[in-house]
A protein has these predicted regions:
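Transmembrane alpha-helix termini and helix-breaking/packing motifs in multi-pass membrane transporters
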Residues: 47, 134-155, 274-275, 362-378
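Helix-to-loop junctions at the C-terminal end of transmembrane segments
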Residues: 41-54, 268-285, 371-372
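Cytoplasmic membrane-interface "Motif A"-like loop-to-helix N-cap segments
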Residues: 51-65, 278-292, 311
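Intracellular juxtamembrane helix-capping segments at the cytosolic ends
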Residues: 98-112, 327-341
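C-terminal transmembrane helical hairpin of 12-TM major facilitator-type secondary transporters
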Residues: 284-332
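Helix-loop boundary and gating motifs at the non-cytosolic
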Residues: 1-39, 214-219, 223-243
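Intracellular loop-helix junctions on the cytosolic face of multi-pass helical membrane proteins
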Residues: 23, 74-77, 81-85, 99-100, ...
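C-terminal ends and interior cores of transmembrane alpha-helices
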Residues: 60, 64-81, 291-309
Length: 407
């Protein structure tokens, strides 16, 4: 849960909060898009975390610094220059959260043996989803309730981030007492920063000289091209008034629709995608998954033209789109694993996740400007056109028919 909440706060809650505070879609997409950067470059500094302190120390310390970041956001919102101050605090949370991911993943492998890791992986994934619902759903609903009850939007969001700050202080203290101290969790001895840098350069070289590396990188960057643009504008679209082309939902309604119903659809889609791939393999399910991650984006074209008044149809549309995304995203993650196989598997997979974040960052940064230039209906039509790029990059993939099948 401590891994999911900061990421959700940086990537999703920030866009809702800034929209409610009157920031333009152009600025929201551009400046929150930059916040992907720590996850893009995370592979570059992750080896150095191994050289200093323990994974346990890093995990607990980063949680406390995340709490400080959330507190800074809370205190900045009532000021006249809240945008600059809160963005700086979000940068702190983003870099700290990315470092926390490195440490927590490493601690997981030190504290548990192979059997225990397999046993708890499902529980870990479940708690990640619960935290996502708590962040995108419950916390946004809470902020909406405070907005409605007080009429003071900055104060409502200050309280929300204050609660998140207190939560992470408590998590840091709790983990300080509860986390064990595995004997294997210690700084790497006899290895210098220069050695790590040299090994990383070798990993970097072998990554780019792998067979079909160019096609793989294009796939990592472009498979989610439509989603990279959509994700920054979905919440502003739902919050914007009808006369501005939006759906006119309240903050609390957005928390329920996108943060709860949407996450349920995403989770179910992901589970079924994993089951399907396990039975037929990635190659068999690639094109159904490509269709699943792209074609449901048509619901936003419908919503932008119809602008339905009731929540029922909006919930159905968001569920369908997020279900498709969850199902289709399975192919993406499986291909990253497939491409990473061989020497330096772990390091190559980390580099793949960097390209994954970059593929979301760059298109998303310009999405707000594009939407404000052409309007919501044409923007959503544009994302449908971008689906052709997804189909194109997948056409060049070479995949072993047996990969992903249950042995």
């Amino acid at each position: 849960m401590a891994e999911a909440l900061p990421y959700v706060a940086v990537m999703t809650i920030s866009t809702i909060m800034y929209k409610r505070l009157g920031i333009s879609n152009t600025d929201i997409a551009l400046y929150t898009g930059w916040l992907y950067l720590p996850w893009v470059i995370k592979p570059f500094w992750s080896p150095f975390v191994d050289l200093m302190k323990t994974k346990r120390w890093w995990t607990i310390s980063m949680q406390f610094i995340i709490a400080i970041g959330f507190a800074c956001i809370a205190f900045s919102l009532p000021t006249s220059f809240f945008f600059q101050l809160s963005l700086a605090a979000f940068w702190l949370v983003a870099f700290t959260s990315a470092t926390h991911d490195i440490a927590a993943d490493g601690y997981y492998m030190h504290a548990l043996d192979d059997h225990e890791q397999s046993l708890y992986v499902g529980i870990r994934s479940t708690f990640y989803r619960i935290a996502t619902v708590a962040g995108q759903g419950l916390l946004v609903i809470l902020a909406g309730f405070l907005e409605d009850s007080t009429g003071d939007i900055p104060w409502a969001w200050s309280m929300t981030f204050g609660i998140m700050s207190v939560t992470f202080v408590l998590l840091s203290i709790y983990h300080g007492f509860i986390l064990s101290r595995p004997a294997s969790d210690r700084p790497i001895q006899g290895v210098t920063a220069r050695t790590v840098a040299r090994e990383f350069l070798e990993t970097f070289r072998t990554f780019f000289t792998k067979k079909n590396a160019l096609v793989a990188i294009l796939f990592m960057l472009l498979y989610r091209l439509p989603e990279a643009q959509l994700v920054k504008l979905i919440n502003p679209f739902m919050l914007d008034p009808v006369e501005k082309g939006g759906l006119g939902l309240t903050t609390g309604e957005v928390g329920f629709v996108y943060g709860t119903v949407g996450i349920v659809g995403l989770t179910i889609g992901g589970i079924l995608g994993g089951i399907a791939a396990a039975h037929g393999g990635l190659k068999k399910w690639l094109w159904p998954m490509v269709c699943a991650i792209t074609l449901p984006d048509l619901v936003y074209v419908y919503l932008s033209y119809a602008q339905p008044e009731g929540l029922g149809i909006v919930n159905v549309c968001i569920f369908i789109e997020q279900f498709g995304y969850g199902f289709g995203f399975t192919a993406y993650m499986l291909y990253l694993i497939y491409f990473s196989e061989g020497a330096h598997k772990t390091a190559h997979y980390a580099m793949c996740t960097g390209f994954m974040a970059l593929g979301m960052m760059l298109p998303g940064m310009m999405a707000g400007w594009l939407q404000e230039t052409i309007g919501y209906p044409h923007f959503f039509l544009w994302t449908i056109i971008c689906c052709l790029v997804t189909f194109a990059v997948c056409a060049f993939l070479k995949i072993d028919p047996e990969f992903g099948k249950k042995k």
